[in-house]
Regions:
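Extended, Lys/Arg-enriched charged tracts that mediate electrostatic binding to polyanionic substrates
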Residues: 1-21
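Adenine-nucleotide phosphate-binding core of ATP-dependent small-molecule kinases
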Residues: 141-159
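Active-site palm subdomain of RNA-directed nucleic acid polymerases
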Residues: 155-177
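Polymerase palm active-site segment centered on the conserved acidic dipeptide of motif C
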Residues: 188-202
Length: 202
C-alpha cells in the first residue's frame, strides 16, 4: 500500500487497509515481506464470546448452554442451524453465510421477537434467546450486546493472542481482520499453538 491507515473504533476493533479487502483478495494476492501467508480465526466468533458471557448468566450445567458452547467451540454452530431448518436454506448457495446473517439479526438486530429468524433461534435455544432479548430491553439499546461482544473479541485478539505472538516469535509481522490473524506460513505451528492455548483457556 502507498497509503496505510489504521484506527481502533470505540469497541476495540482495528480497521486498516486489510479489513476493507475481501477475504479472497487477501488470500490470493497478499504476502508479508514476500512470504506466503495464511490466517487463523475464531470459529463462530460472536456466538463463541456470547457463550463465555453466558457462563456468568446461566447454570453452566444447563444442557442448552452445554450444547451451545460445544457447537461454537467446534465451529459447528451455523451447521447446526442449517441442519434443523433445511427448507429455509435450500435456495441459498452459501448456507453458512446465510445462517451467520440469521444469527446476527437475532443477536444484534433491531428485530421483533416474532420475526422468522427469532422464532427459529428460539426453537433451538429458548433460554439463550430470552437472555438476548432481555439484555436488549434492560439496556434500552439493541446494540449493547454487539458492542460488548466486539470488545471481548478485541481483548482476546489483541490483549491475549497478538500480544503473546509478538512476545514469543521475534521478528514476526502479522495483520488482523477483526477475529482473524494473518501471518507468514513458516510460523504456522507456533502461531497455532499460541492461538489454541488462549482459545482453550478463555
Amino acid at each position: 500500500f502507498s497509503y496505510f491507515f489504521f484506527i481502533f473504533d470505540d469497541y476495540g476493533r482495528l480497521h486498516t487497509n486489510f479489513t476493507v479487502l475481501k477475504k479472497e483478495i487477501r488470500k490470493n494476492n497478499l504476502k508479508i515481506n514476500g512470504e506466503n501467508i495464511e490466517e487463523i480465526d475464531i470459529p463462530n466468533s460472536q456466538p463463541f464470546f456470547l457463550s463465555r458471557l453466558l457462563r456468568d448468566e446461566m447454570d453452566i450445567s444447563d444442557p442448552e448452554l452445554k450444547l451451545f458452547t460445544e457447537l461454537v467451540e467446534n465451529g459447528m454452530f451455523y451447521d447446526y442451524i442449517i441442519y434443523h431448518f433445511p427448507e429455509y436454506f435450500k435456495e441459498d448457495n452459501d448456507s453458512r453465510n446465510m445462517a451467520k446473517k440469521l444469527t446476527y439479526k437475532v443477536l444484534f438486530g433491531h428485530n421483533g421477537i416474532k420475526s422468522i429468524q427469532s422464532q427459529m433461534f428460539k426453537e433451538l435455544f429458548p433460554k439463550i434467546f430470552d437472555y438476548v432479548i432481555g439484555v436488549k430491553k434492560s439496556k434500552g439499546d439493541y446494540r449493547y450486546l454487539s458492542h460488548l461482544l466486539m470488545k471481548m473479541e478485541s481483548d482476546f485478539v489483541f490483549g491475549k493472542v497478538v500480544n503473546d505472538i509478538y512476545k514469543q516469535i521475534r521478528g514476526i509481522n502479522i495483520f488482523t481482520v477483526h477475529d482473524s490473524i494473518t501471518y507468514p506460513v513458516k510460523y504456522r505451528d507456533k502461531v497455532k499453538q499460541i492461538f489454541d492455548s488462549h482459545f482453550k483457556n478463555y
